[in-house]
Amino acid sequence: MSGDPKIEATAVAKTKEDTNKVDIKAMRQFVEIKGGIENEIYNPENATTYFYREVRRSVPFIKVPEIIKPNGSVNFGGQCQFNIPRCGDYLLNLTLYIEIPKIELNITETAAVPGGAAASLHRVGWVKNLAHQLVKEIKLNIDDTTVVNIDTAFLDMWSEFMTDNGKFDGYKEMIGGSKELWDLDDKVAGAGTIILPLPLFFSRDSGLALPLSSLISSDISVEVLLRKWDEVLLLEDINNSKNKVIKADDIKDGEPKLTSIKLIGTYAVASKYEVNKTRCDDRRMLIEKPFKASEYELPVFDSGKLDEPIPINMEKINGAIKALFFAVKNTSRSNEHSVYKVGLPIPGTLRIDGGSLHALSEIGINLAEHVFVPSLPIEYYSYQQPYEHAKRIPNNRDLFMYSFCLDVGDVDPMGSINPKLLAKRLTFQIKPTKDLAEATKNKQTFKFITYALCNRLVSIRQGKFTLLSQSMYGEDGEDE
């Protein structure tokens, strides 16, 4: 075309001396050659150069940690409250540290083994992923409102789908996945420190950090409810390889006690300019709030089909649903709280009694009277959905998700569904496997659990933090 730039002959002509050199002048002219798409995406006006870095300026700030101790003494089975101090202008994250004591058995029964030696009949150890199973419930309270409420199963699901692959192995070590804690020993369950980063909304992005300098009239606290020691400790009888409930008399020093528990908060301290500006300004935040939407006890199956749809409780959900996390949880044992298989873990191993058996073969989702997701193989929810919309595909293939948004990891609005538009009717249609049907006949018990991850609007005004109600059209209603 006549309007296209021309490459001058002198620009590409080369002598014998420079045949191995790049002709910069010629290359620059090649860069200037543009077609339709280049004219669309490369525009000198308001364009960014990649070779002249513009600094995005910020007010000055510094990041500092602070140890937060609970009110009073705390032990297994107790509830501890942490009042969040104002050690900075913003709260970035909170991490729970729990020191676990050593457990030494008081049982002296032995049996002969090949070679003539005597071995203990019993072995003891902590459950795997101890932090998830020891922490029964976590609440973030601001004034009289519970802003976030999470439990063991949500911690299991969130970590599997939303922890970056590069951090996942380290995360498992932090929460008690190391063999030193869960490996069963003849006499001793090892001591150690378990570390649990709390997945609260303000840890998701620095732009959602909790603005303490603006919340001058609000009291902020975190409540942690712990399970009893005998709910997270395993005792195995070698004769029959069964997980037995341990008693205080079985332990040398009697009933065990926690060594210590604390939170470490990460704060940002900003300049006076920012503090003065944000303290005076009203603002709104779009936060994430998980809801426990169902805990449906599965019946004994006489066939491989569940005729009645599993309802999801939308009564307390007030917000736009980003994603659903769901699973069939095996509730057969009082001291195993993170089992999502048919069959039960063999203490001291990574194996499942009877093999790693799936509970479901297909899952469908209905919205109101309509099929929203047809009945699909479970791999759609454990592989394809997290591959497309989460940070990782879970190691545990019996944890499932369905995303209404494009990217669950992004805190910006990227799609959602309003449950009020559905007249609060959302159901799952599941197809149990034969293994699940047999297990229910053999007195294993299961629950279908669902969590809805929702967006909520928050108002920060006159020093107070308020969750806003939303109408079915997304307009702000009265404060809760």
UniProtKB/Swiss-Prot annotation:
The keyword Electron transport does not apply. Gene3D superfamilies: Adenovirus Type 2 Hexon, domain 4, Major capsid protein Vp54. GO terms for molecular function: structural molecule activity. GO terms for cellular component: viral capsid. It comes from the Viruses. InterPro entries: Capsid_N (IPR031654), MCP_C (IPR007542), MCP_C_sf (IPR038519), VP_dsDNA_II (IPR016112). Pfam families: Capsid_N, Capsid_NCLDV. Keywords: Capsid protein, Virion. Major protein of the capsid. This is Major capsid protein. It comes from Trichoplusia ni ascovirus 2c.
